[in-house]
Amino acid sequence: MSEQTKSDLKRQHILDTGRALVIKHGFGGVGIARLLSECNIPKGSFYYYFASKDAFGQALLQDYVHDYLSRIDTLFTDAGTAYAKLDKFWSAWLAQAGSEGIATQCLVVKLGAEVADLSEDMRIILDDGVDKLVTRIAGLLRDGVQDGTVRSFADPDATARMLYAKWLGAAILAKLSRTQTPLEQALAETSSHLSPHNT
């Protein structure tokens, strides 16, 4: 293994560990000392990769957005109708047997309000990631009109953003209530809203 590969793996280990901690405790709740302890690395190693905690936060969000969109692209390019792909995406927000759903792992849900006030650079990264996701959802809405599985909307882009906002709200309510009921309601409402039979 080359030194560059080892360096890349160590950096990724810090980001992966940081993501797990931030999902649980929030960005402000994770100090560098705790991160170093969890990663079992010296302080110098952290500052070799990241100039500051804010720089670490930016890298963490860039890594998260890239990973998230890559998984979405895989899902959205699978075989099947546009409606089936959208239904699979929304259903993935709910916890399934043996695994957590997207809602519990979503850094937009966890950090959106926090980083918007904390770091302009981090806010921009998350906002750009949301824009790219919404664009993908809007594309599937258009595809669904073409394949006859999704009703036609006057403004697919606005509809996609509205649907994503609905799911963010449902995810926050699910965290507050510690139940999946808000997500289940969002799934039922979204399915009804998209159906070409409910025009």
Where are these regions (language model features)?
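N-terminal intrinsically disordered/low-complexity leader segments
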Residues: 1-9
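Small-residue (primarily alanine) positions within well-ordered alpha-helices
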Residues: 17-18, 39, 144, 160
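Hydrophobic alpha-helical connector segments
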Residues: 59, 73-104, 156-163
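Short, solvent-exposed amphipathic helices
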Residues: 63, 74, 121-132, 139
